[in-house]
Regions:
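Functional-site microenvironments in short loops/helix caps that host divalent-cation chemistry
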Residues: 11, 17, 21-22, 60, ...
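Short, compositionally biased
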Residues: 1-63, 88-89, 116, 123-125
Length: 192
């Protein structure tokens, strides 16, 4: 992407197994879902990329969530290769500026898991050595993050990185506790 320098990976159209049988209530049931083909960023947005967005748009570097009286994260001052932190509104604005959109939860889950029913990008067994794990480096102690793309053993079947661990990632749709059970079987876009 010429605006932010991000590399994208292609996730082809098709079915995948969404959810799980023995998970939290809002992750069940496991169902086959069809998702159209889409591009997704190979890594989470970095601080360096987010700074380009702030400069180009004149937005403040403080995370503000409408109706939330607290500052949830510090201003953008961390090292450029760490993941950027922001509100859902910031993430949506960033994606629009970069010429894309936030993925739906179904798109994100397919990009992370692939089509063979695995639970994690690397397979179905939890492996702390493959997760984009938290570090305790003095520089990022308070945030507990690591630079993006530094856990290649956790690469998804489509080549996306850091889709298990490090930071939570925003998706386009809103949350509903029964949505995995109630969602349409083709291109679910989230609850109303």
């Amino acid at each position: 992407n010429p605006l932010d320098g991000s590399e994208m990976v292609w996730v082809p159209a098709g079915e995948f197994l969404r959810g799980r049988e023995n998970g939290y209530r809002d992750e069940t049931p496991a169902r086959k879902i069809h998702v159209g083909g889409f591009w997704i960023s190979k890594t989470p947005v970095t601080v360096e990329q987010y700074r380009k967005f702030l400069k180009a748009t004149g937005r403040e570097d403080k995370i503000k969530i409408p109706g939330w009286p607290y500052q949830v994260c510090p201003p953008v001052q961390e090292e450029g290769t760490y993941p950027a932190l922001g509100s859902w509104y910031d993430a949506r604005a960033y994606c629009a500026w970069a010429g894309g959109s936030l993925p739906t939860e179904a798109q994100w889950e397919k990009a992370a898991r692939g089509t063979d029913g695995r639970l994690y990008p690397w397979g179905s067994e939890w492996d702390v050595e493959k997760v984009a794990r938290r570090t305790w480096d003095k520089y990022v102690l308070a945030l507990g993050m690591h630079p993006v793309g530094t856990a290649p053993d956790g690469t998804s079947p489509y080549g996306a990185l850091d889709m298990a661990g490090n930071v939570w990632e925003w998706v386009a749709d809103w949350y509903a506790p029964n949505y995995y059970a109630d969602a349409p079987a083709k291109n679910p876009e989230g609850p109303e």
